[in-house]
Amino acid sequence: MATVTEVLTEPFTAQGVTLKSGPIKVHQEELPAVELSDIPLPPPSKEPTEVLSIDKPTPDYHVPRDPRLIRLTGVHPFNVEPPLTALYDEGFLTSPELFYVRNHGPVPLVKDEDIPNWEISIEGLVEKPLVLNFRDILQQYDQITAPITLVCAGNRRKEQNVVRKTKGFSWGSAGLSTALWTGPMMADILRSAKPLRKAKYVCMEGADKLPNGYYGTSIKLNWAMDPNRGIMLAHKMNGEDLRPDHGRPLRAVVPGQIGGRSVKWLKKLILTDAPSDNWYHIYDNRVLPTMVSPEMSSSDPNWWRDDRYAIYDLNVNSSVVYPEHKEVLDLASAGPSYNVKGYAYAGGGRRITRVEISLDKGKSWRLANISYAEDKYRDFEGDLFGGRVHMSWRETCFCWCFWSLDIAIPELENTDAILVRAMDEALALQPRDMYWSVLGMMNNPWFRVTITKENGTLRFEHPTDPTGPGGWMERVKKAGGDLVNGYWGERQAGEEPTEPEPEKEINMKKEGVNRIIDLQEFKKNSSDEKPWFIVNGEVYDGTAFLEGHPGGAQSIISSAGIDVSEEFLAIHTQTAKAMMPDYHIGTMDKASLEALKNDNAPQSDEPRATFLQSKSWTKATLVKRTDVSWDTRIFTFQLQHDKQTLGLPIGQHLMIKVADPTSKEAIIRSYTPISDTNQEGTMDLLVKIYFDTPTVKGGKMTMALEKLALGSEIDCKGPTGRFEYLGNGKILVSGKERHVSSFKMICGGTGITPIFQVLRAVMQDKQDPTSCVVLDGNRQEEDILCRADLDAYEALDSKKCKVVHTLTKAPDSWTGRRGRISEDLLKEHAIPDGKSMVLICGPEAMEKSARKILLEQGWAESDLHFF
């Protein structure tokens, strides 16, 4: 990233074309009070250079992307939002790699050499129709640079989908991003064509060819010509040429309106006397009246053709970012207050004038502090990224703002929810209740974060989780709460619980795929390189997901050539199931399915040297149970014979299948034994039992294990996992070998088990020079697991092994560290050096916190491994 001075002084070009504004100039003499460093500049950006394996088989095979983005519609088309906290933590401006994306279809392939001659036409009701190429646009028109927030009309739609399924796919609350856009004003382009008097609308059309034609929409001509509206064409974002997903090489940017009006890959501006008749303008981006059901909208197209229901300006909206969804606040280590913070925005250039927070269900409100970073550009006059920043005269607001408020911890303890609402300068206020509509767009009720008190902590929950099931709305609905009763589903006195709607079965088949596959073809195409597998009689090709699978390629390879219905359905989320149509290739005929069952039956009862098999389950018998503490056990299982070893590579895990004691349904989870990999005849599992509490249901698997009688059998299968330690600093990650000189091991609770496996392998080999630092976080001293072994390894060689324990509820006699695994602790013991790897396993909140801190400290994503 260039320094501030470099950004503001070097000449700028776009794809080799020099901009009209020429060399960059800064007019400091007019604004003596403004320092260059006061202007928000883009965050550090690292453009992806490799196409993700998940995209290689798709029409977007040419588009490198950031793997952190959350895919909302499976593999293709590409519709994503960034993780909410990552988006917020980047600051006012968003890097291109984290900028949200809404694509209706394939991204047009635009080669570098074609860009200077990229053409757009200005036609329709004009006196002088024009065709301009990219060079013309850069060289013949004044260039401006302005900060603008784009927001998808579907932002927060998942909340509507929980209440009642809409026709739109689910978005969380991160469907927005902000950038510095550079290019000419649309008005200047249109004036060149001399619009006729009867022209009322500007219809825009992109180069993305879709099933119903090219994507197009329209805005009013008087908006495009109004300098206060700031509507422009852009060829740069944050000083970089547009990337493919964001409209390379040219797009429209319509501030204050929904993102769907900012057409990407722009090819046409057509002036008309009526709104666009493009299919995507009519059947998308509308808020139909709430009484219109999906069935009504499908049977009567007149609902869609009424332009009164079209969306243009954004409405007022806000969201909480901190506390995060699923964040857990330990009251023992918490400070006197918590800084609640988030974002807000409005539409049509209107300023957010207040953000209010309530802790008593809306009976009383307090004002949050608001930061308007956009205003800093109004005090600056100069050129930035090849465009003039000239906002001192303009009072319209086109960007999000950040808000915050310190709330005393006792106040959070005494409430069950945080409510947030915003108001703009037109006194438009976020409503308390949701306005459900058939497309689920413009969802903007008060943002509510629930607080659950349990075991000395406060657990926070957002309305939904964009990555899968979760959030207080789903929880309340499953418990029989009526989410539209005006009380967020809370039952009032005398109110009976409602019967929750049956959960809709997710379709895992690709529409239009009618191919019948027999056993011979299935076996022929079921290899490590091309793993075909079966779920519920349907055939899937997992090749494209070998590299991207969170459990490692082996998880898919182990499924090759077999029916994995039971384990797939038991362990995969709704999000994972929704991805399956992208890999669906056909249906297996019934005769072949029956033959496959027999084909996959165990072939031999001959004793094996190793216990685990990657493609079939093997039974182990519970022979011993040792209580480590009131809620932690070591379960010892007998293998098939006394000389048999487990066969689990160091750093990997195995799947365990147990029948639910009540429903008898299979429960499948992954575990890492604490027994030595060379131990013969038995294996030991260290398990923390999650018992039922008055507010939280206990862990299904751990409760099932707790109820196992001696002599009971479990099923085991494996190995699985992306990581393997080979010894002497050599590791395999997703099949790729590398060398490290040290491990920084971060764990909490039973997350010690995979960490312990690697540590033991290093310490047992006296010739292994790899050093290890273990940061082990727990609540109380009795919760520290494997402590005797950890202390013994440190005593054996303190230079090779260092163990740091930290407790959140330490007794007065405790002489070790106190508190959570914090930023200070990681700065002290986990400094990035380019030769180390961080291994992490523990509660989700701990893992998320550690990941955020480590990335901020300079660790690369590829140097972090989460078990």
From Swiss-Prot:
Native source species: Aspergillus niger
GO molecular function: FAD binding; heme binding; molybdenum ion binding; molybdopterin cofactor binding; nitrate reductase (NADPH) activity; sulfite oxidase activity
Function: Nitrate reductase is a key enzyme involved in the first step of nitrate assimilation in plants, fungi and bacteria.
The UniProt record lists the keyword Heme: yes
Family of this protein: Belongs to the nitrate reductase family.
CDD domains assigned to the protein according to its UniProt record, in alphabetical order: cyt_b5_reduct_like
GO biological process, alphabetically ordered: nitrate assimilation; nitric oxide biosynthetic process; sulfur compound metabolic process
Name the record gives this protein: Nitrate reductase [NADPH]
Superkingdom field: Eukaryota
Keywords: Disulfide bond, FAD, Flavoprotein, Heme, Iron, Metal-binding, Molybdenum, NADP, Nitrate assimilation, Oxidoreductase
Domain Cytochrome b5 heme-binding, first and last residues per copy: 514-589
Chain segments carrying region Disordered: 38-58
Subunit structure: Homodimer.
Entry note: cofactor: Binds 1 FAD. Binds 1 heme group. The heme group is called cytochrome b-557.
List of residues binding NADP(+): M837, V838, L839, I840, C841, G842, P843, E844, A845, M846
Catalytic reaction list: nitrite + NADP(+) + H2O = nitrate + NADPH + H(+)
Domain (FAD-binding FR-type): residue spans on this chain: 615-726
Entry EC number(s): 1.7.1.3
Binding, heme: H549, H572
